[in-house]
C-alpha cells in the first residue's frame, strides 16, 4: 500500500522558478489513443475486408502491476513534471496518515 500526499515541495525546472516550490500531485492517466496515428491507420487498412485477424494478438502477459506515474504541477508557474514510482498493487493519493499500532485496511 503506497500512500502519497496531494502536495509536495520539490524542485521546479520552470524558467521562472528553478528552485524548490510547492507542487500539486495527481496520478498520470494515459490519453485516448488517436485513430489517425500512422500505425492505427495501417492496422485498420490491413484488417478491413475478408481474412480475419491479420496481426498476432498478445496473450503472454507477464506483469501483474503497472508502475505508478505522478504528475507534479508547480503552484507558482504551472509547469508540469512526471515522476515514476516503483510497482505496487495498492496506490492511494492523499489518504489518511498511518497511526501506530493500527491494523492495515484496504
Swiss-Prot record:
Protein name: Large ribosomal subunit protein eL42
Biological process terms in GO annotation: response to antibiotic; response to cycloheximide; translation
Superkingdom of source: Eukaryota
Misc remark: Confers resistance to cycloheximide, an inhibitor of polypeptide elongation.
Keywords per UniProt: Antibiotic resistance, Cycloheximide resistance, Ribonucleoprotein, Ribosomal protein
A GO MF label: structural constituent of ribosome
Pfam families per UniProt: Ribosomal_L44
InterPro entries on file: Ribosomal_eL44, Ribosomal_LSU_eL42, Ribosomal_zn-bd
Organism this protein belongs to: Wickerhamomyces ciferrii (strain ATCC 14091 / BCRC 22168 / CBS 111 / JCM 3599 / NBRC 0793 / NRRL Y-1031 F-60-10) (Yeast)
Recorded GO CC terms: ribonucleoprotein complex; ribosome
Protein family (similarity comment): Belongs to the eukaryotic ribosomal protein eL42 family.
Amino acid at each position: 500500500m503506497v500512500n502519497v500526499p496531494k502536495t509536495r515541495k520539490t524542485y521546479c525546472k520552470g524558467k521562472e522558478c528553478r528552485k524548490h516550490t510547492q507542487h500539486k500531485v495527481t496520478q498520470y492517466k494515459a490519453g485516448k489513443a488517436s485513430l489517425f496515428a500512422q500505425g492505427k491507420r495501417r492496422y485498420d487498412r490491413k484488417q478491413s475486408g475478408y481474412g480475419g485477424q491479420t496481426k498476432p494478438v498478445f496473450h503472454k502477459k507477464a506483469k501483474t502491476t503497472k508502475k505508478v506515474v505522478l504528475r507534479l504541477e508547480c503552484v507558482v508557474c504551472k509547469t508540469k513534471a512526471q515522476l515514476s514510482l516503483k510497482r505496487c498493487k495498492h496506490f492511494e493519493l492523499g489518504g489518511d496518515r498511518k497511526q501506530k499500532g493500527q491494523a492495515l485496511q484496504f
